[in-house]
Amino acid sequence: MKPYKIENIRNFSIIAHIDHGKSTIADRLLESTSTIEQREMREQLLDSMDLERERGITIKAHPVTMTYEYEGETYELNLIDTPGHVDFSYEVSRSLAACEGALLIVDAAQGVQAQSLANVYLALERDLEIIPVLNKIDLPAAQPEAIKKQIEEFIGLDTSNTIACSAKTGQGIPEILESIIRLVPPPKPPQETELKALIFDSHYDPYVGIMVYVRVISGEIKKGDRITFMATKGSSFEVLGIGAFLPEATLMEGSLRAGQVGYFIANLKKVKDVKIGDTVTTVKHPAKEPLEGFKEIKPVVFAGIYPIDSSDFDTLKDALGRLQLNDSALTIEQESSHSLGFGFRCGFLGLLHLEIIFERISREFDLDIIATAPSVIYKVVLKNGKTLFIDNPTAYPDPALIEHMEEPWVHVNIITPQEYLSNIMSLCMDKRGICLKTDMLDQHRLVLSYELPLNEIVSDFNDKLKSVTKGYGSFDYRLGDYKKGAIIKLEILINDEAVDAFSCLVHRDKAESKGRSICEKLVDVIPPQLFKIPIQAAINKKIIARETIRALAKNVTAKCYGGDITRKRKLWDKQKKGKKRMKEFGKVSIPNTAFVAVLKME
């Protein structure tokens, strides 16, 4: 590391919508500052997971320290890369709290999108210096002036410092580095000497344990210090080493001082011990107040995960345990289902988080799993005044005891071309949405603000939005309040027995159509037996939809060649009695494909 000068440090982040070129610009910055040699360079260097590269998204925040010579001075540039998706908005807010500036990257052909809007507002709340960057300027469809106008009018940013660049060709990259030095303010000199460091992420390393990523606000942290976490008021730990991201995590001598970004290792073994947004201080000279903005991360969406082969239960348990080491937001609870066997109830930050965990289990651990339909946390107010929070249909109390139920709602911003307005309004109406306002983003695009139940968002809202806008629509959401709703438990009965894996909590208005569609799907995927199988959807024991799987026909008179009809009749009567007995005592075996088909449909 170069000699320490707080006025020569610049901490910045990159804000961008999915696929607007954030990771590619980060690659070019690393190249231009010679942080990484050309022969070691690969695309999306900071996106370490295969899944991040394939989907073109950032899931984990990746910091990196670069040095750059400008006008005879050496500057330390700390890039704190952030996830772009709305599911990870708390991590984004903590990463932004570690910065003084941000690059707002906008695709010069596509313009401002919903997720970049959400993160820009987080940056503006923190009073960061925002530098607009128009990427993909080399595309024939690029409209730099129109996009500048969008940024000015809709976000309210001054675009006089806008940089036109192409991460593909490298055009505009030196200008970005110079703008960071000129426009992003250095960290404020600390007013106190006690250590105060913001935790913005953590990572589990199998060799050294937990690496805690910090931005030092005041004081310094060095090897041998005894530190504690202020918000969680846990036990104290000895710092075993400190390091910087160059771009790989590299241990170093000396200390991390005010304004700098790096990591430390202590004898921490679980990511749960380290909370994002917490404040680190020393035991000997503790800071008086923790940094503002800390809150516990709580899961929003829940789903059950079961192994298709029950002998894989221990492997699944191990897989979830390993994923949890690097993901403190993932919650795991063991549960059992009458039809699916033993599995886990898991909590996620949102639908993307859930998809990523499922995909990583399948890929990294080579497991075949079934996931139940995603659910949210409902509030149940009982007649005796008690309040319950449930995320699982099996926890639904006796309807006679319920005073009313409430469901979580969200504020949604949708950006769409004008021609799809009526399609989106129909979609939101179908999802029980309430339109708050409509604004013009430019002469071709609109921003629609809606309130929607979270349960309607977590099912298939994104797919349907992409479908009705031919892929041009984008949205982001933030959690709102709970509102009263007619939420009921829908049960599916197969041969008069309820199958818990198909039960779900739905709004009364949607119960009949949902029940009917599940019954129709099951008729197609459950193989016929030797007796009729009724498939029914029920609410509070009342049947609202029914389908029947017809019995397999077995010709019991095949061995009778001619002869008396009474012989045949006797055989038919015997078969009828046998079928009746089978219907009473026979078990219907439901193939795994049936569970997968229904849960995919949901």
Swiss-Prot record:
<comment type="function">
    <text>Required for accurate and efficient protein synthesis under certain stress conditions. May act as a fidelity factor of the translation reaction, by catalyzing a one-codon backward translocation of tRNAs on improperly translocated ribosomes. Back-translocation proceeds from a post-translocation (POST) complex to a pre-translocation (PRE) complex, thus giving elongation factor G a second chance to translocate the tRNAs correctly. Binds to ribosomes in a GTP-dependent manner.</text>
</comment>
<feature type="binding site">
    <location>
        <begin position="135"/>
        <end position="138"/>
    </location>
    <ligand>
        <name>GTP</name>
    </ligand>
</feature>
<keyword id="KW-0648">Protein biosynthesis</keyword>
<dbReference type="InterPro" id="IPR013842">
    <property type="entry name" value="LepA_CTD"/>
</dbReference>
<keyword id="KW-0378">Hydrolase</keyword>
<keyword id="KW-1003">Cell membrane</keyword>
<dbReference type="InterPro" id="IPR000640">
    <property type="entry name" value="EFG_V-like"/>
</dbReference>
<dbReference type="GO" id="GO:0045727">
    <property type="term" value="P:positive regulation of translation"/>
</dbReference>
<dbReference type="GO" id="GO:0003746">
    <property type="term" value="F:translation elongation factor activity"/>
</dbReference>
<dbReference type="GO" id="GO:0005525">
    <property type="term" value="F:GTP binding"/>
</dbReference>
<dbReference type="GO" id="GO:0003924">
    <property type="term" value="F:GTPase activity"/>
</dbReference>
<dbReference type="GO" id="GO:0043022">
    <property type="term" value="F:ribosome binding"/>
</dbReference>
<dbReference type="InterPro" id="IPR035647">
    <property type="entry name" value="EFG_III/V"/>
</dbReference>
<feature type="domain" description="tr-type G">
    <location>
        <begin position="7"/>
        <end position="188"/>
    </location>
</feature>
<dbReference type="InterPro" id="IPR009000">
    <property type="entry name" value="Transl_B-barrel_sf"/>
</dbReference>
<keyword id="KW-0997">Cell inner membrane</keyword>
<dbReference type="Pfam" id="PF00679">
    <property type="entry name" value="EFG_C"/>
</dbReference>
<dbReference type="Pfam" id="PF03144">
    <property type="entry name" value="GTP_EFTU_D2"/>
</dbReference>
<dbReference type="InterPro" id="IPR027417">
    <property type="entry name" value="P-loop_NTPase"/>
</dbReference>
<protein>
    <recommendedName>
        <fullName>Elongation factor 4</fullName>
        <ecNumber>3.6.5.n1</ecNumber>
    </recommendedName>
</protein>
<dbReference type="Pfam" id="PF00009">
    <property type="entry name" value="GTP_EFTU"/>
</dbReference>
<dbReference type="InterPro" id="IPR000795">
    <property type="entry name" value="T_Tr_GTP-bd_dom"/>
</dbReference>
<dbReference type="InterPro" id="IPR038363">
    <property type="entry name" value="LepA_C_sf"/>
</dbReference>
<comment type="similarity">
    <text>Belongs to the TRAFAC class translation factor GTPase superfamily. Classic translation factor GTPase family. LepA subfamily.</text>
</comment>
<dbReference type="GO" id="GO:0005886">
    <property type="term" value="C:plasma membrane"/>
</dbReference>
<keyword id="KW-0342">GTP-binding</keyword>
<dbReference type="InterPro" id="IPR006297">
    <property type="entry name" value="EF-4"/>
</dbReference>
<dbReference type="Pfam" id="PF06421">
    <property type="entry name" value="LepA_C"/>
</dbReference>
<dbReference type="InterPro" id="IPR004161">
    <property type="entry name" value="EFTu-like_2"/>
</dbReference>
<dbReference type="InterPro" id="IPR035654">
    <property type="entry name" value="LepA_IV"/>
</dbReference>
<keyword id="KW-0472">Membrane</keyword>
<feature type="binding site">
    <location>
        <begin position="19"/>
        <end position="24"/>
    </location>
    <ligand>
        <name>GTP</name>
    </ligand>
</feature>
<keyword id="KW-0547">Nucleotide-binding</keyword>
<dbReference type="InterPro" id="IPR005225">
    <property type="entry name" value="Small_GTP-bd"/>
</dbReference>
